[in-house]
Design a protein with these regions (language model features):
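Rossmann-like NAD(P)(H) cofactor-binding subdomain of soluble oxidoreductases
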Residues: 56-58, 64-144, 160
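Internal alpha-helical scaffold of NAD(P)-dependent oxidoreductase catalytic cores
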Residues: 83, 94, 121-125, 144-231
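NAD(P)+-binding Rossmann beta1-loop-alpha1 motif at the extreme N-terminus of oxidoreductases
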Residues: 1-54, 61-64, 90
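Glycine-rich phosphate/pyrophosphate-binding beta-alpha loops
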Residues: 135-136, 198, 241-244, 248
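Alpha-helix C-terminal capping/helix-to-coil transition sites in glycosyltransferase folds
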Residues: 70-71, 186, 238
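Divalent-cation-assisted or electrostatically stabilized phosphate/pyrophosphate-binding catalytic cores
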Residues: 248-259
């Protein structure tokens, strides 16, 4: 039996946690700092803050007790990127060294470094990245969703992919941790600019021109910082770029539309 803990009870943690709980994985816990969210999940089967209209699986539990980390087989980090590194260092005493840590957050870590770079050499745990075009609302509503799993050691890919077998979550795989991280960060910048273009010009020609230039620039930046060009063709690359830049559910695109 796998014991899975999601650090964070926000939209993405709740959505992916509910996927596993609905599958029948016995021990799925959201570790939260929000007492009201914990109470609403455990007592009402709803996350009233993030998904007030979605009934959650009875297998999904929530707690504020960090001791649940000690026995976890897999820990998903579902908190903002700027908090991931600090959280892991501050709570190192609770971490099982054999737990697989899977980072869901998209963005820079402490001191504007990539999160894997901040963690490297400080934890014995296997550390994986899980990035892709993934609106939490669609995940929890059972829409098929693709993620790229990135890790330096291939043996852990099967453990995570088997966990999600027969669910609406699909995977591709990469050893290019730097490229996967950069792709998940850079697309946010271009999404804002594409939103600005669409708000001010609403030109299909101009949008297509800028998308082409953006993809080429992302590719160059990834290569220059040690990533691999092939990562642009994973879910974390063009897939996440397209979702974030061209869909009005995207917060970054929406910001651009409002500027």
């Amino acid at each position: 039996m796998k014991k899975v803990v999601f650090v964070g009870s926000g939209a993405i943690g709740t959505a992916i946690g509910n996927v596993l709980a609905r599958k029948g994985v016995d021990d799925i816990t959201l570790l939260s700092i929000e007492e009201e969210v914990v109470e609403s999940i455990n007592n009402l089967r709803y996350n009233l803050t993030y998904f007030p209209n979605v009934k959650l699986s009875r297998n999904l539990k929530a707690t504020t007790d960090k001791s649940v980390l000690k026995d976890a087989d897999v820990i998903f980090m579902a908190i903002p990127s700027v908090a991931v590194v600090g959280y892991l260092f501050d709570n190192k005493e609770y971490l099982n060294p054999k737990s697989i840590i899977v980072n869901l957050a998209k963005g820079f870590g402490k001191c504007d470094c990539l999160i894997p770079d901040c963690l490297q050499g400080h934890f014995p745990n296997p550390i994986m990245m899980m990035k892709g075009p993934s609106f939490a609302r669609e995940i929890i509503n059972r829409q098929d969703t693709g993620f790229t799993l990135a890790c330096s050691d291939n043996q852990y890919f099967s453990e995570i992919s088997e966990l999600f077998e027969n669910t609406n979550i699909r995977f591709d795989f990469s050893n290019d941790i730097t490229g996967v991280e950069l792709a998940s960060i850079l697309k946010n910048i271009y999404a804002i600019i594409i939103g600005m273009l669409d708000a001010n010009y609403d030109s299909a020609n101009m949008r297509s021109l800028f998308i082409t230039k953006s993809i080429n620039e992302m590719r160059s930046l990834m290569i220059n910082f040690g990533g691999q060009e092939i990562s642009m063709f994973n879910y974390c690359g063009f897939g996440d770029f397209a979702l974030t830049s061209l869909n009005d559910m995207s917060r970054n695109r929406t910001l651009g539309l409002l500027i």
